[in-house]
Swiss-Prot record:
Ranges that cross the membrane: 4-24
Name of this protein: Uncharacterized protein C607.07c
Upper classification of the organism: Eukaryota, Fungi, Dikarya, Ascomycota, Taphrinomycotina
Membrane topology listed for this record: Single-pass membrane protein
Subcellular location: Golgi apparatus membrane
Disulphide linkage map: none
Chain intervals for the UniProt region annotation (Disordered): 97-143
């Protein structure tokens, strides 16, 4: 058996050793997991480990859980408006009772063709006055 045979045998033995080591480590890991799952729940150590495996961030002070409402709520509180200098002109004019849209009923339509045209004109006038972009409907207009 020459040098080539010794090298080939050592490579085969090292690969076999890696397979055996991998199998032993998998077996140990599965036994450990099985023992952890069937361990007594009253055991403080196993329950802490299990809680950590369920949520690894639970003991971290940097992690703060947000529910869906907190995550998507982008409304600004009125108390926060007082701390924003750029919002100060709007604070005096904010009111939840001031609507953006004019809620008055449109004028009744007339039946003649001429009055129908004037009715359409009145309708566009009421649409303009009901627009939230019209200055007199804006709650932020300073009078």
């Amino acid at each position: 058996m020459g040098t080539f045979g010794i090298v080939a045998l050592s490579i085969i033995c090292s690969i076999a050793f890696l397979f055996v080591a991998y199998g032993v480590l998998r077996l140990i890991n599965s036994i450990r997991r099985r023992n952890m799952m069937t361990a007594d729940v009253s055991s403080v150590k196993s329950s802490q480990t299990w809680n950590f495996l369920k949520n690894p961030f639970s003991n971290s002070a940097k992690f703060e859980a947000l529910d869906a409402d907190d995550m998507w709520d982008t409304r600004v509180e009125e108390a926060e408006l007082n701390t924003i200098p750029s919002a100060s002109p709007f604070i005096d004019h904010t009111s939840e009772t001031v609507p953006f849209v004019n809620t008055e009923a449109p004028p009744p339509r007339l039946s003649s063709s001429f009055s129908r045209q004037s009715g359409e004109n009145a309708e566009t006038q009421s649409q303009v006055s009901a627009s939230p972009f019209n200055d007199k409907n804006s709650p932020y207009v300073q009078e």
